[in-house]
Swiss-Prot record:
A GO MF label: 5-dehydro-4-deoxyglucarate dehydratase activity
Name listed for the protein in its UniProt record: Probable 5-dehydro-4-deoxyglucarate dehydratase
Top-rank taxon, per record: Bacteria
SUPFAM superfamilies, A to Z: Aldolase (SSF51569)
InterPro entries cross-referenced by the UniProt entry: Aldolase_TIM, DapA-like, Dehydro-deoxyglucarate_dehyd
Pfam families reported in the protein's UniProt record: DHDPS
Organism encoding this protein: Variovorax paradoxus (strain S110)
Keyword field: Lyase
Amino acid sequence: MNPQELKSIMGSGLLSFPLTDFDANGDFNKKGYEKRLEWLAPYGASALFAAGGTGEFFSLTGDEYPGIIQTAVDTCRGVVPIIAGAGGPTRFAIQCAQAAEKAGAHGILLLPHYLTEAGQEGLAAHVEAVCKSVKFGVIVYNRATSRLKPETLAALAERNPNLVGFKDGVGDIEAMVAIYQKMGDRFAYLGGLPTAEVYAAAYKALGTPVYSSAVFNFIPKTAMDFYKAVAADDLPTQHRLLKNFFMPYLDLRNRVPGYAVSIVKAGAKIVGHDAGPVRTPLTDLQPAEMEQLKALIDALGPQ
């Protein structure tokens, strides 16, 4: 897939990040992952991001990564495009990007590097090195320690035609407006705050109607219903789902740092699609929290 095709995929629809399946020992569970993708693929997501943040990219080894991406590509071939997460130190990010391209992924989401703070020049060098290492499309992700400014993005886009997408995980509306005004239709834009449904209507008003849904992993019908409500400006449906599910879910998710991933694995377990435990340093939900989440899910009805 050429970069412009990736940009087109990101232009509309709901995106999601499948969980990565682990067994009781915390090792990659290939068969479980295949079954998960087979279950999610028909629900209508425009693309699935393998080994993204919700897929615990930050806990995967370099040896595991190529096999996980290959499994996703092979399982979803001809059904739904696969975009791979890639990130970490520049050389490791390049290894991941090249492995994803070799596996047949449609592009990468370049996740923030780990811990190290850097200025715009260093961030740009990191992004450009990854872009230059592959031919397929790259989506850059503003989050945490990696926050590219409009001028930096413009310079990168001019030098790297395969940089075609921008995902925002910061939530700085002023910065998002500045980036959109600077870059226009040069990029496809993706809302990427945790539990993105809460912010979906606001991002749509900014010119970013596409977002990634973590809850698609366990309530795919509700996730699609909410996306359709946002697309149709159906405020009553949005407000009903926000009040009855997403805001109570948010309260539960915010109890412990790292629960943004843990609660998704908990939800998958509750609906009968157990993905196994999270890897440390994340922790699984407590039994009482599982019961609270189950009550929220049950109230939504069949998926």
